[in-house]
Amino acid sequence: TKLLNLACLIPGGDPMAKKKFGVHPYIPNSVPEVQAEMLREIGAGSVEDLYATIPERLRLKKSMELPEPLLSEVELKRHMETVLSGNTSCREALSFLGGGCSQHDVPAVCDEINQRSEFLTAYAGEPFEDHGRFQALFEYQSLMGELLDMDVVNVPTYDGAQAAGTSIRMASRITGRDHILVSDTVSPARLLIIRNYCRSDLKIEEVRHCPVTGRVDLTDLKSKISKKTAAVYFENPSFLGAVDDQGEKISDLIHRAGGISIVAVDPISLGVMAPPSHYGADIVCGDIQPLGMHMQFGGGHGGFIATRDEERFVREYPSRLFGIEETALQGEYGFGDLLYERTSFADRDKSKEFVGTAAALWGITAGVYLSLMGPRGMEEIGKTILQKAQYAAKRLCELRGVSLAFPKAVFFKEFVIDFNKTGKSVKSIQAALLREKIFGGVDLSQGFPELGQAALFCVTEIHTKEDVDRVVESIK
């Protein structure tokens, strides 16, 4: 514990003791006697010795301006409740927000299972003590494999954006190429993460979309594919909601050039949509948040990566893969890591890519959700979402000056509403709706300025006819 707490030591002696309230009650290591004992334990002469390798220009030269501490639990609780009371949650307001985090029904059993003490950790587990967790994650992988019609699915990575970045780097390693084509309808936030993952050695180039259908522009794609192209990455449905029925053509184009087809998909759509593996995808990735997870922002949603069971793909997974095998006892099976030597946990500084296990718990949650729903349940949810989204789009377009930004787009649960002819900004419409406790869609005017005043609306199985009618009347 003493060694782990060294990160809390502050250079320059004990600046916290110089504050008018003395030693900070939340930072035990600010006590001079505690610091001295820790330094003796590791044989260091001073706190400064611990930071000798850090250049002077990067060190903080002054005391941290921390706020006055709240000394009692009652004061702290009251302060936090006051801060949080400034928020309006989706429990209080009617939400049509999506764009990467959407509101779906979370069956009570999902929360019940993921809060059990034997599962309640973000970590994936250890082979000698976590057989139950390994089995649960193996079951998740199997269920996702069935949903995606793919052979291999990883233990969840941090989120869908990391899964996308990792899938692209896998494709680059497999092909030995450095040119990546990405659809320009990808979320600006996700594209930033992809660029960050790839900026050291890969070149990201965007492919235009059709302004009427929202689909990938095949002519532009053909002109940009070359023998240096490692992969084409597109999303189906896209961030802007459009379903692309050209998946097979896109995959054929990149395959002819010797590259890899990567498709990101919303897993809850697969009860009614064909999985990407059916139209040529080599790597399928995405976010499992719709599968039994509450909306949240600031933590891992859980991302998945799926491929065929081919060595050239499996060897490039940086994340953990769990398998099943017979034990020495007849009729008994064990669950454990496959090809562990390819992971960053084994290769450390020589690994191809680093990955953590911060979202493994969500894999168990998604496994519970999928086992509860089954194929028929997923189909029912998909059909319900389709019907409700179509009704919402139709009702909104009945308003004066309101239309679909992509009039010929096929969409699943999200669609772009064009407010340009209303003479009002999305920001002003959102503000008016918020006063009525309604979140009216994601403002696209910054991320996609070419669309002008447009908003991305998300409708799922939780929305009722009355909910849709309410937002329409409020906008009117």
Q: Where are these predicted regions, by residue range?
A:
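Short, Lys/Arg-enriched N-terminal segments with co-localized hydrophobic residues
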Residues: 1-15
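Charged, compositionally biased N-terminal leader segments and the immediate start
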Residues: 13-31, 38
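Hydrophobic alpha-helical scaffolding
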Residues: 24-28, 40, 66-70, 130, ...
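Conserved PLP-enzyme active-site core in the AAT-like
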Residues: 26-27, 162-334, 401, 417, ...
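N-terminal entrance/gating region of PLP-dependent enzymes' catalytic architecture
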Residues: 52-139
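Short loop-beta-helix segment that forms the pyridoxal 5′-phosphate
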Residues: 127-129, 145-165
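Active-site C-terminal subdomain of aminotransferase-like
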Residues: 291-400, 404-408
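Conserved C-terminal alpha-helix-loop-beta "cap" of PLP-dependent enzymes
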Residues: 376-470
